[in-house]
Amino acid sequence: MYKFKTKPYKHQEKVFHQSKDERNFALFMEMGTGKTKVAIDTIGYLYQSKKIDAAFIIAPKGVYDNWVHKEIPQHLPDNIPSIVLRWQPNITQTYKKEFLDFIEASGHLKLFVMNIEALSTEKGSETAKWLFRKHPKSMMVVDESTTIKNRKAMRTRNVISLGQLCSYKRILTGSPVTKSPMDLFSQIGFLSDKLLGFTSYYAFQGRYAVVKRRTMGHRSFQEIAGYQRLDELNEKIEAFSSRVLKKDCLDLPDKIFVRRNVPLTDDQKKHYTEMKKLALTLFQDGMLSTTSSVLTQIMRLQQICCGFIKDDDDTIRSINSNRITELVDILNETSGKVIIWASFVHDITAIRDALAKEFGEQSVATYYGQTPQEERQQIVKNFQEDQTTRFFIGQPRTGGFGLTLTAASTVIYYSNSYDLEIRLQSEDRAHRIGQKNNVTYIDLVSPGTIDEKIINALRDKIDIAGQVLGESIESWIV
């Protein structure tokens, strides 16, 4: 009998027993309900049952490191001998040895973790294909499966092709339909084209979409005008999936904290290193002797993590960054209303523009220092009551105190304030009287940067402003 390493919540145990022996299954579990644990327990169970000897986990860049460093060590039982290999595109001598050790290991459950973006490259897809062929008794997990909703994308085609080499398959997402029920075709097609009964996308579209022909100028094309037979589609999906919402999970903690990694781009790394060197020089020259001067340097490092530099004359220069892309990916995985806190006005306007483009102008509201006083109450009212206003993008110094924003049960920190009180107050805009659900807090963090130091201090309830003087200055900058 399989013994859990970490005690599951009731909904996790139910889904585990419902799905553990299924060849193909979809875990449609809202963010914060613990779908990763269910997948890891399934891998462990199938290994102990001698049904698989390897697992291949495909996840977005901001998530796949969590599988390696947090989720697998936390949930995979200690009595299961395992070896974990994380994909990296740069093949060093050390990595070659790790790769060979992984291939040659026997008597171990092998777990290979790869970012989905790598499957858009020839090197990544060929490596994965070679590994999969070496391990036919395997399970493949696609975490945040909306990343393969585009049936024409190279990575989608590669994922579906790789899936045909595996014995067991799982897709994990909190929101399988981001814009259209047509999003389901390739996600479920990865599991098996027999599940929906269609091998042709156009046959699937013809059954569940209303398609009309439009003419613009001399060009004629078909356009989806609506959807049909969705009850039939839902009934089919229920046969091979579990849908779990936070509001139905009565034993979850009131507050759930999630971290999404956003690695720095090469451009950001260059500027970050230069800014660190400058800050260290100022420290060594005795020019960082006040709290405000140290916090200014911390803020400048933060700005680089967010994707911009503010020069001494207040000119703002954008830097190539993945942070907004990661934010949009998260929102595509999330259902319902969302609060997005950002410390810098430049980020608030950039986020607003990106979300308006992705989800529509009416879906976005902003609330920060420059928001006119006479508009503020209406903005909050619209967010609380109007279904079209889905995203509240705010500056925690302005909107983090006193407001009631309980229409959202997901809160994203695009960037964090170093002020503990501001963090705690901004958390409570959603988590207060009137909130009927557990609240999930998602922090965007660039690993190995000031982001990590700030979030660790805030989680430990440390007021950073009181900790950055004296000998500790250097540790904050480095």
Where do the model's predicted regions map?
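Conserved pre-motif I regulatory segment
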Residues: 1-28
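Conserved nucleic-acid-binding Ia/Ib motif block in the N-terminal RecA-like helicase ATPase lobe
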Residues: 64-106, 110
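Conserved helix/coil segment N-terminal to the catalytic DExD/H
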Residues: 92-111, 117-136
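SF2 helicase motor core recognition
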Residues: 120-123, 179-181, 348-352, 376-377, ...
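Walker B catalytic acidic pair
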Residues: 143-144
